[in-house]
Amino acid sequence: MSARPGSSTRQLTESVDIFPTLAELAGLPAPKGPQPINGISMVPVLKDPGARVRDHAFHAYPRGKLGRAIRTERYRLVEWRRPGEPEKNAQYELYDYHVDPLERENLAAKNPGVMKKLKATLASYPAPFSRA
């Protein structure tokens, strides 16, 4: 490793990145299995805190409805809907961390361009399963 102790980074990461990162640090081959490994090794960021390996992070959170979110350095888009429910019934939250780091003002209705871009990124992730 070449990053100085105490270094910080602005690189977004997710808990699914831990496994591929540890595997690479241990010198093991890239993890493979019957289910896809969604994480990305963060070793490049450990070596150079300025390195970038992705431009967003994805997470999902159940709270009555399923909240699926895309987080970029600037924005967080959250989509709330029940599994199997059509997208037209979804509720959205959009926050701009440059001016509202505490997520107090939902900008979803005010930023259609940002919404369109982040919704397209969100659509690249598997839709939640529907309950029969």
How would you label these PLM feature ranges?
Residues 100:
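Intrinsically disordered, low-complexity polar regions and short flexible loop motifs
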Residues 3-4, 11, 16-19, 23-97, ...:
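C-terminal cap/loop subdomain of S1 sulfatases and analogous C-terminal strand-loop tails that border
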Residues 6-8, 106:
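Second-shell loop/turn segments in exported
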Residues 105-113:
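Active-site-proximal N-terminal segment of extracellular/periplasmic enzymes that hydrolyze or transfer
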Residues 70, 115-118:
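Hydrophobic packing residues in well-ordered alpha-helices of helical domains and bundles
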Residues 24-27, 106, 117:
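Acidic/proline-rich low-complexity IDRs
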